[in-house]
């Protein structure tokens, strides 16, 4: 069954290029597109940087026709700044706007951005709702299982984000506390996918180190 984000048809087994700081720049995206990426995202872009018109942030808005479909990923800790950033990003005409609720690095999370917002789910939901309202483009989310072992609320969180209008969710199978240690827990990603209330595409992320591993996880977890 073909996977769609609104009118964007990604095929039966879509492969997404995850947004990675200092990695998923235009040359790297071109390489991935050539080798079959079905959907790509830019490096994440700071809302504060875009509003200040900082050169490094503005440069990351550069996208090219051959990259489509492509999403621009944004991050930030303030709802109003993220709303303004959404309006700026929409003017560059990407196919999707993606929200980063998953970056675990201290300089991002300690400010309440990225995975930091997993400590305040009501704010996460409110921010998402304002972003959805601010654009006509599809909005997607990248996140983690939770802040730590005791807050793995991703099944509920995914439902709430769907209810305020996101059109797909990508889940990294670790908590923020884990960073990139241990194994990604794909059973929880599968629980989101198999939740009968979920109507939007659910994508898994974490430990996919080869084409064979991607097929294995697809067959095992259905994600």
Predicted segments with their positions:
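Flavin-dependent oxidoreductase catalytic cores
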Residues: 1-223
């Amino acid at each position: 069954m073909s996977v769609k984000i609104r009118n964007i048809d990604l095929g039966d087994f879509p492969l997404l290029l995850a947004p990675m700081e200092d990695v998923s720049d235009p040359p790297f995206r071109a390489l991935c597109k050539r080798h079959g990426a079905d959907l790509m995202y830019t490096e994440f872009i700071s809302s504060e940087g875009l509003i200040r018109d900082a050169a490094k942030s503005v440069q990351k808005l550069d996208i090219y026709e051959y990259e489509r479909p492509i999403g621009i990923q944004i991050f930030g800790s303030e709802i109003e700044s993220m709303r303004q950033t959404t309006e700026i990003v929409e003017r560059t005409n990407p196919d999707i706007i993606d929200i980063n609720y998953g970056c675990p690095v201290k300089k991002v999370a300690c400010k309440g951005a990225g995975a930091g917002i997993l400590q305040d789910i009501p704010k996460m939901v409110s921010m998402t709702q304002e972003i959805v309202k601010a654009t006509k483009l599809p909005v997607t989310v990248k996140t983690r299982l939770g802040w730590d072992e005791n807050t793995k609320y991703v099944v509920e969180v995914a439902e709430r984000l769907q209810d305020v209008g996101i059109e797909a969710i990508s889940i990294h199978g670790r908590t923020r506390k884990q960073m990139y240690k241990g194994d990604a827990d794909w059973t929880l990603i599968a629980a989101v996918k198999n939740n009968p209330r979920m109507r939007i595409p659910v994508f898994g992320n974490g430990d996919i180190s080869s084409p064979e591993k991607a097929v294995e996880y697809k067959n095992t977890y259905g994600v």
